[in-house]
């Protein structure tokens, strides 16, 4: 064999290998970026969330989305479909910033006619710079540029881990996956023994940072709201946005008090709600003053994360119009409940519930 023949053979084999790899990834498509999986169970886990969300947002059939952090991961779209109508999917980003959540909304609105957004608001998510993601997002899966998908085609994890997982489940299906994806509710221990060990309470009164007389959004919050919330609300007047504030345990609010930022956080929350309520296509629900939930540590695995039963209960409550905020007086009343419960905890110097 001559050098030219050897070179031609080598190049042909190389081209065949490259083409075969691209074809294999594109056809099997473990993250459903090009088409929804029908011949196997896609490897959708909390660890693949930002990859899986790209395919779900692009190629699943839906008209409603769940947006938010781990506080939203235990929602069951089948229940939401029954309560609100339509077809829900979850586009959650565990620990996401408001920019991360904005990216999910952007892809959903650019590919589907979205009639309803259920959005769980964590104030922490608005403390980041409005263009800052809290996770490294595979942006090449979120755009329409096919050429940069080379990072997907030749991804070592895709080739060595996720394609084999797909092949293992070849011929199988999981009709419940739309509910079970990202769901962690059954994986942890709940109750005082899980939440309280090692935690020390104090009767010491902590001076709170001055929040000002009138609730006003901080500059950081303003930028997040202006860039990551309002454009979608204003550009999609026929879409119903259902924002809710998750029911963190009372211990979480006590920690905020210990840090001296309780009043600041409550004022930021009130100012944010007042901005959102100015829009006709927005509903706001506040579950943070639900004493029957937040004082019962059997609902929690830590200071914030509650069971799937609470997600189910929130869905039922929203469908019934319960805990809906319609004005400033109601916000202040809810905040007063939190203040009072924290005061009880400080006075007791131990968990009194």
Locations of the language-model features?
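C-terminal regions of proteins
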Residues: 270-353
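Extended hydrophobic/aromatic segments used for targeting, binding, or gating
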Residues: 233, 238-241, 249-297
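Membrane/wall-proximal cationic-aromatic binding patches
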Residues: 28-90, 96-107
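Membrane-embedded segments
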Residues: 71-153
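Short loop/turn segments at strand-loop or loop-helix junctions that form parts
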Residues: 120-124, 198-204, 243-249, 287-290
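Hydrophobic membrane-insertion alpha-helices, especially the h-region
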Residues: 8-26
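Secreted/periplasmic serine-hydrolase-like ester/acetyl group-modifying domain
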Residues: 121, 130, 134-235, 239, ...
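Loop/turn elements at helix/coil->beta-strand transitions in domains of secreted/extracellular proteins
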Residues: 61-63, 86-87, 113-116, 236-241, ...
């Amino acid at each position: 064999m001559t050098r030219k023949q050897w070179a031609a053979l080598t190049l042909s084999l190389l081209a065949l290998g490259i083409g075969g790899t691209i074809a294999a990834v594109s056809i099997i498509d473990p993250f459903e970026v090009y088409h929804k999986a029908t011949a196997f169970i896609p490897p959708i886990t909390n660890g693949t969330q930002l990859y899986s969300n790209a395919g779900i947002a692009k190629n699943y059939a839906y008209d409603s989305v769940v947006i938010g952090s781990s506080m939203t991961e235990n929602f069951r779209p089948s229940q939401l479909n029954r309560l609100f109508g339509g077809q829900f999917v979850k586009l959650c980003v565990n620990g996401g910033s408001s920019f991360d959540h904005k990216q999910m909304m952007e892809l959903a609105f650019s590919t589907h006619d979205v009639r309803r957004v259920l959005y769980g608001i964590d104030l922490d998510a608005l403390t980041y710079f409005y263009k800052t993601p809290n996770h490294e997002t595979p942006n090449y899966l979120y755009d329409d540029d096919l050429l940069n998908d080379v990072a997907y085609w030749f991804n070592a994890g895709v080739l060595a881990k996720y394609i084999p997982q797909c092949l293992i489940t070849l011929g199988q299906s999981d009709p419940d996956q739309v509910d079970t994806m990202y769901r962690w509710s059954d994986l942890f221990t709940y109750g005082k023994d899980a939440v309280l060990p090692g935690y020390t309470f104090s009767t010491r009164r902590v001076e709170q940072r001055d929040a000002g007389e009138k609730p006003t959004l901080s500059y950081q919050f303003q930028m997040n709201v202006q860039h990551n919330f309002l454009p979608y609300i204003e550009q999609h007047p026929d879409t119903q946005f259902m924002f809710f504030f998750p029911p963190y345990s009372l211990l979480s609010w006590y920690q905020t008090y210990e840090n001296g930022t309780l009043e600041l956080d409550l004022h930021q929350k009130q100012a944010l709600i007042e901005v959102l309520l100015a829009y006709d296509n927005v509903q706001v629900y506040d579950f943070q003053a639900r004493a029957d939930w937040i004082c019962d540590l059997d609902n929690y695995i830590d200071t914030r994360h509650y069971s799937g039963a609470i997600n189910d209960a929130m869905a039922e409550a929203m469908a019934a119009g319960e805990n809906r905020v319609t004005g400033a007086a109601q916000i202040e009343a809810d905040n007063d409940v939190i203040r009072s419960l924290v005061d009880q905890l400080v006075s007791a110097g131990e968990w009194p519930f």
